A protein has these predicted regions:
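Charged, gly/pro-enriched flexible loop segments at helix/strand junctions
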Residues: 2-6, 105-107, 147, 151-180
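Retroviral integrase
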Residues: 1-139
Length: 180
């Protein structure tokens, strides 16, 4: 086993990300669903899912996107932020769909005090929380689709995203700061 040449004192320690209140920090990521290409009820071919997680409460929002493009991401973010309000910190991976001019302008227009933080993709120290949500979305979506197929339905995955989000958000122990 090789020793690390940098002394332990000089190496950066892993610092967990803490958020105390709702909307302190939102983490967002895109999930690839290109192999499950399905049309939504309006005939649009959906290939991606955007997962947005409030870091303090664990509240998760998911929505389908036809393409991995910045203007579509900005539109969905504006829709979600219009409903629940904007975050203090907007945390993403370094993807071009999150660092594009239209997304940064949207954040600036909502509130010039929003801090946009980018981490490295698929890195547990930066993106671990939202990557866990991605896994959970895939797992819960699979079980909801299987359950509906057993009931004799042939559901489209884009039509059950609301049920998937509700299942994720209603799991026990999801809210970190729950005092009850």
């Amino acid at each position: 086993m090789r020793k690390n040449p940098v002394p332990k004192k000089l190496r950066g320690s892993i610092k967990p990300i803490f958020s105390k209140n709702f909307r302190d920090r939102f983490q967002v990521d895109l999930i690839n669903f290109r192999r499950l290409r399905k049309r939504d009820p309006f005939g649009v071919l959906m290939r991606w899912v955007m997962a947005l997680k409030d870091h303090a409460t664990g509240l998760t929002f998911i929505c389908a996107l036809p393409r991995k493009q910045a203007h579509l991401v900005a539109y969905k973010l504006q829709e979600i932020f219009g409903f629940i309000g904007y975050p203090k910190i907007f945390h993403t991976d370094n993807g071009k769909e999150f660092t594009a001019k239209c997304v940064l302008e949207l954040l600036r227009n909502l509130n010039p005090n929003i801090v946009s933080v980018t981490g490295r993709p698929r890195r547990p120290r930066d993106q671990g929380s939202v990557e866990n949500v991605n896994k959970m979305v895939k797992r819960v979506l699979g079980s909801v689709l299987a359950e509906r197929r057993l009931a004799g339905q042939n559901p489209n995955w884009t039509e059950v995203l609301g049920s998937v989000a509700a299942a994720i958000n209603s799991q026990s122990g999801r809210c970190k700061n729950d005092v009850s």
